[in-house]
Regions:
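Alpha-helical interface subdomain recognition
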Residues: 1, 88-231
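Solvent-exposed alpha-helices and their adjacent loops that cap or buttress functional pockets
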Residues: 1-2, 11-15, 27-32, 53-58, ...
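A short core secondary-structure module
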Residues: 4-48
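Residue-level signal for inorganic ion chemistry
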Residues: 5, 38, 63-65, 105, ...
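A generic structural signal for well-ordered coil/turn residues at beta-strand boundaries
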Residues: 15-17, 31-34, 43, 59-64, ...
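Short, glycine- and charge-enriched coil/turn segments that flank and shape catalytic ligand pockets
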Residues: 27-33, 71-79, 158-163
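Flexible, small-/acidic-enriched active-site or ligand-binding loops
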Residues: 41-71
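A short, charged helix-loop
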Residues: 61-89
């Protein structure tokens, strides 16, 4: 086999000594069948890694393949059956990312509550203002709803339930919506300090933004959820 093409935004792609590459070995471009996986050395002839950072500081790379020769011995799994393996791994990865995102949401809520207890305006702590208390209750509820969906998705995937994929899609939709709500409120309630490098609020927000776009954003997972649930 000879691989040509490019894989973009590969996490730690420039640091790996081997990469598993999906390539079409049969079928049409949009077919699920016909995708095969190959284990390719990162230093193989024709492989180029273009390294860069995302806005949250994570290192990724674009991997360019030009006439990269691979043998049948380098194939992972059955010929043309790679799509199912990819889907399985991505579901597990989405759970891991959601757990990380949930931890960030918890920290943003906790740090915001603590800040409003110490930041004073008009001679009193801003956390005593009922309007701000309501907003912090809303973000707490958003966090709890996301946590419940994470637990549900973990159970569904672990038990190989029929609706496991639907549960993961629902989780990613909630993570996107609740995450945006929580980091937006955290930044606003911290004021201008919320976007400075001195505080970790902005760093958490940027990481949460990247988590919410990795392996599909909320709109993508909403469409996938609808297709599985209602079609």
């Amino acid at each position: 086999y000879v691989i040509n093409g490019e894989k973009v935004v590969v996490a730690n792609g420039a640091n790996a000594d081997h990469v598993i590459v999906s390539a079409r070995t049969s079928g049409e471009q949009s077919d699920e069948a016909g995708i095969s996986l190959f284990l390719v050395p990162a230093d193989a002839a024709g492989v180029e890694a273009i390294d860069y950072r995302l806005m949250d500081g994570q290192r990724v790379a674009n991997l360019v393949f030009k006439d990269v020769a691979v043998s049948a011995d380098q194939r992972v799994g059955e010929l043309g059956a790679g799509f199912g393996l990819i889907e399985s791994v991505v579901q597990q990865a989405n759970l891991a990312l959601a757990a990380e995102g949930l931890g960030i949401m918890q920290q943003l809520n906790a740090k915001t509550v603590e800040y409003t207890r110490t930041r004073e305006q008009f001679g009193v702590a801003i956390g005593s203002f009922q309007a701000l208390q309501h907003r912090m209750v809303e973000t707490f509820m958003a966090y709890e709803q996301t946590k419940s969906l994470l637990y549900r998705a973990v159970c569904a995937l672990t038990d190989e339930q029929e609706d496991a994929a639907t549960a993961v899609h629902a989780l990613k939709v909630m993570l996107d919506r609740a995450g945006r709500q929580i980091y937006s409120e955290a930044i606003q309630l911290h004021g201008g300090m919320g976007i400075t490098d001195e505080l970790d609020i902005g760093h958490y927000a940027k990481r949460l933004m990247m988590i919410n776009t990795t392996f599909g954003n909320g709109d993508y997972h909403q469409a996938q959820f609808n297709a599985l649930r209602y079609n």
